[in-house]
Amino acid sequence: VIKHTNMMFYNFSITLKTCDMDLILCDMPIWKHVYHTLHSLDQWYINPEVYTEPDFHEPNLNSLDDYDNQKVLSREMLIDYFETIKEKITEYLNSLCDEDLYEKPDGCEYNRLSLILGQFRHFHCHMGNINATTIYNTNKWPKVLGMYWLDKIDDCEDINDLYE
């Protein structure tokens, strides 16, 4: 779980660097899709019943059904939020043992493994949508590291390695 979460984080760091935040997808700018993806990860990966919104959050800011065009999140804000989530989830995962994955967090109807797998599904779905806009508009394929890279994530840090 830890290695796959780290791979997910690395792949999304590439997405954050390659996407056009102002591009519109389904009537919403990409930055809003990015925030929706990150907000869901932040809320649901650990325990949705014990969750505090980020300081900059406003009602419906994470919604892909509601866009009032009042607040815009910059790439820098989203990267900072992403880094905060990464730290929180990494600390959380390092505190767990395998048996903990089958237990339900306080007040939650799902066990920890279900929450994590649900976020893998949701996160990768949205990351794919965001990456598809980059592919369509630039004719470049953002690098997505797979199983081969599980033990080699640190080998792809150069900006020139952001695309396949």
Question: Where do the model's predicted regions map?
Answer:
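Amphipathic, well-ordered alpha-helical segments in soluble domains
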Residues: 4, 8-15, 40, 85-88, ...
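Generic structural concept
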Residues: 2, 6, 27, 34, ...
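Acidic/histidine-rich alpha-helical segments that form the ligand environment
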Residues: 65-103, 113-124
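Short, contiguous alpha-helical
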Residues: 13, 17-63, 106-164
